[in-house]
Amino acid sequence: MVLNFLTRVFGSSNERAVKRLQPLVDKINALEPRFQKLTDNELAETTASFKLRLANGETLDDLLCEAFALVREASWRTLKMRHFDAQLIGGIALHQGIIAEMKTGEGKTLAATLPAYLNALSGKGVHIVTVNDYLARRDAEWMSTIYNFLNLSVGIIVHDLNDEERKKAYASDITYGTNNEFGFDYLRDNMKFDRESLAQKELNFAIVDEVDSILIDEARTPLIISGPAEKSTTLYAQTDTIISAFKKDIHYNVDEKAKSSTLTEEGVALGEQLLGVENLYDPSNIEILHHLNQAIKAHTLFKRDVDYIVKNDEVVIVDEFTGRLMTGRRYSEGLHQALEAKEGVKIANENQTLASVTFQNFFRMYKKLSGMTGTAETEAAEFKKIYDLDVLVIPTHKPMVRKDFPDLIYKTQKEKYQAAIQEIISLHKKGQPVLVGTIAIDVSEDISDKLKKRGIPHTVLNAKHHKAEAEIVANAGQRGAVTISTNMAGRGTDIVLGEGVKELGGLHILGTSRHESRRIDNQLRGRSGRQGDPGSSRFYLSLEDDLLRIFGGDRITAIMNKLGIDEGEPIEHGLISRAIENAQSKVEGHNFEIRKQLIEYDDVMNQQREVIYRQRRQILTDSDLSTLFKDMIQDQAWQIHAMYKNDKQHPMEWDLEGLKDTVKKQFNLEIDLSPAVCEDIDADALGELIETTAIDAYKAKESLLGPIDTQRLERYIMLQTVDSLWKDHLLNMDHLKEGIGLRGYAQQNPLILYKKEGYEMFEGLVERIKEETLGIFFRIQIAESEPLEPIQKPRQENLVFSHSDDSNVKKPVKRAQEKVGRNDLCPCGSGKKYKKCCGA
């Protein structure tokens, strides 16, 4: 009571927020005569003037009123469309990083031109995000008339563009595209090997159309670029069968401290003999060599019932510190498969994620984010919690006069559909257009069959063909039209009423079920009553509908029985309407919790992703990587030193042979640790000796190659190593997330465990990147002095770009270097010809 009284006196918080923007709207309107007097050329030249003022210290907010007035005048001259005050308010909200709820037909597309133009003046780019290629192309081509008139460029990002076309589109002042393409381009850029081929600029400002669909409905499904993890699991089994022939200290050496094993020359020869391979170090056999090394490691360093157990025909890791089973965790780099082969259980063959990101985390990377939709208010709490976005309901240009009738509830679905069909026929005979909303395609087809039998002409909207969809929806307001569609279909296209339809009551919306979300129901209703047009809506429900059956069907059935409702008779009752709304609120709350939990888990991966991608971008763009390499050499030198250091012993008493072997393995160099050297040396001096010896070896290689070729080689090796280990890490993190909830940890939060173990795994990843990068760099042999040929991209898998089941886009990428010719570049990355390097 008190709250209602205060709202009547002071207005709602939304009304107050709108009122605060009114002075800006008044200023824009006051500027209109000034811009009307300018010639076309003078209007266009104003853009350069605005940019100059920005460069001289003014802000976008300082320019807002003039910029909006300019765009309004340009829109009128080019499209004969003038922004209403409601669109100005919407534009201001979008510029301020707020979600603007604008009802259907209120001109969201035109409203977006205002903040898009203003923010494009900074030169940092504006992305306007839509739900499909058709809308992206339509809106870009339509609105580009305004932008081009004002000397701004427009790009379009749609499916099937090549790298050069994408780069050009992103270089534009304003870029239209789909949420999927913007997200995939972010991932693609972080898999590139050449800085010149990077497409996206920084993520500056995004205006997301149908923001509720993209940031809420699609938030639970990540964008994934994947490729096959292995060609086949047979190689694991094949290498496992020959391991018994290998003898310790003859065919391989084991370093238990470093938990590593290495093949000797005799071991390599035996492997070649048993596997029927001429040269295990031939580039085409590197994969076989890797499998052989992992098989030896599995048999010699990992013990059953100590390091792992076999449970339900699966190899499960045992935590070495707690002794607990680490369900869901897998060893990386094929080691887990080698253990599976050793134990004779099924060897996992997985489609490996190469890169992934959720929409939640992708769009939070923009410096400024805003969005628009016809229905956002019911999800305002989620937008605030997840994205820190406020929602502003924009007043309609004309009052809403649509009549929303109470729901009709029947006992059975059969009765419900009979009544709905009868209503459709009745309205069709009257000439009033009807849009029938369903929650599933099969329901649409069932209603279509029933109407065909009654001889009622109608159109079924197929959401798979966006262009056809838009045309069908646009015609849904014609006299006598009957259109059947799923509730979500046809968004982005206004339904314009045909001649004489207003007099018949406008477009009638007939919903055949309530959706789990009130927002989706409101979207369906919102198709009618645009810009003050008449219209009506009603939902037909039954006690057999999922929502009612699962949430409170028994209670509603009892009410209907008490009221003595006969078969075929509907009920309209406020109590039942409230029960349905309560059911929807429960489901919405449940789905919100799922999405919140998803982002809590994905935030762990996102922090790691940002570190790796930032490091990768630095490697790609820095002109000099020598400092980075020297830092890695220093780190690894002192880590090796720490492995063998014993504060209670003089260095002469350390395991110097083991230390020498580890230095050899990491840096491919012999270090003099003879008694003459070590006798008068302390622990720190020995660490410095390892570091300086490795740095000197690095400088010698740099001198031999020359600085330019060294840079190219370093960049290639490091990018390839980062990508290879990162994809393994993604797989391991997936397994961790899947299995973390199955652990038997009493009273422990799975999320906390995931964060802790994920961090430990990430630390291990960073160390492995250093180790492998330096190991490869120091092992590359320079056969003779000749100019390095341009280093090519590494071999790529067949990539799969996936978001949801119906939008998988397979892009086969041709494998390179399946067979290496004598005059081809050596696959090891040295930049030399194969015949002068590994094939010598």
From Swiss-Prot:
Topology in membrane: Peripheral membrane protein
Residues noted as binding Zn(2+) in the record, renumbered to the chain: 826, 828, 837-838
GO annotation, biological process: intracellular protein transmembrane transport; protein import; protein targeting; protein transport by the Sec complex
Localization terms from the record: Cell inner membrane; Cytoplasm
Keywords: ATP-binding, Cell inner membrane, Cell membrane, Cytoplasm, Membrane, Metal-binding, Nucleotide-binding, Protein transport, Translocase, Translocation, Transport, Zinc
Keyword Transport: yes
UniProt entry tagged with the keyword Cytoplasm: yes
InterPro entries associated with the record: Helicase_ATP-bd, Helicase_C-like, P-loop_NTPase, SEC_C_motif, SecA, SecA_CS, SecA_DEAD, SecA_motor_DEAD
The protein's enzyme class: translocase
EC number: 7.4.2.8
GO MF assignments: ATP binding; metal ion binding; protein-exporting ATPase activity
Cofactor binding: number and manner: May bind 1 zinc ion per subunit.
GO cellular component: cell envelope Sec protein transport complex; cytosol; plasma membrane
Chief place where the protein resides: membrane
UniProt-annotated binding residues for ATP: 87, 105-109, 494
Cofactor(s) annotated in UniProt: Zn(2+)
UniProt xrefs under PANTHER family: CHLOROPLAST PROTEIN-TRANSPORTING ATPASE, SECA INNER MEMBRANE COMPONENT OF SEC PROTEIN SECRETION SYSTEM
Assembly: Monomer and homodimer. Part of the essential Sec protein translocation apparatus which comprises SecA, SecYEG and auxiliary proteins SecDF-YajC and YidC.
Family membership noted in the UniProt record: Belongs to the SecA family.
Protein name: Protein translocase subunit SecA
Organism taxonomic ancestry: Bacteria, Pseudomonadati, Thermodesulfobacteriota, Desulfobacteria, Desulfobacterales
